[in-house]
């Protein structure tokens, strides 16, 4: 809501409120990048665990990543995208896989 300052005849401060539209926050794509070492089953687990995909959808995304080199896991606000990227990269590192997750503005 925008506010406009106005003074009345006694020089008292008055506020006029108007209707303004607030733009939605920018969305970010969370992406998985293909590598030659991470097992396909591990990628499916990541997609199910961190992106709430069922087995069929996770398999489709995994195959897309495998054949195209990159795949979209979802669209999120910046903070959520950053959190998911960090969680996936940490999970991959702990399990000694080079799977890389990244994000870019949609």
From Swiss-Prot:
GO terms for biological process: protein catabolic process; proteolysis. InterPro entries: ClpS, ClpS_core, Ribosomal_bL12_C/ClpS-like. Residues 1-10 have a biased composition (Basic and acidic residues). Residues 1-22 are annotated as: Disordered. Disulfide bonds: none annotated. Pfam families: ClpS. Binds to the N-terminal domain of the chaperone ClpA. Belongs to the ClpS family. PANTHER family: ATP-DEPENDENT CLP PROTEASE ADAPTER PROTEIN CLPS, ATP-DEPENDENT CLP PROTEASE ADAPTER PROTEIN CLPS1, CHLOROPLASTIC. Involved in the modulation of the specificity of the ClpAP-mediated ATP-dependent protein degradation. This is ATP-dependent Clp protease adapter protein ClpS. The gene is clpS.
């Amino acid at each position: 809501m925008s506010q406009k300052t106005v003074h009345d005849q006694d020089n008292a401060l008055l506020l006029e409120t108007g209707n303004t539209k607030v733009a939605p926050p920018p969305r970010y794509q969370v992406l998985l990048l293909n590598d030659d070492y991470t097992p396909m089953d591990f990628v499916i687990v990541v997609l199910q665990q961190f992106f709430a995909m069922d087995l069929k959808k996770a398999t489709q995304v995994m195959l897309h990543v495998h054949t195209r080199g990159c795949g979209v896991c979802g669209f999120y606000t910046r903070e959520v995208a950053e959190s998911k990227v960090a969680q996936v990269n940490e999970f991959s590192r702990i399990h000694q896989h080079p799977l890389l997750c990244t994000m870019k503005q949609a």
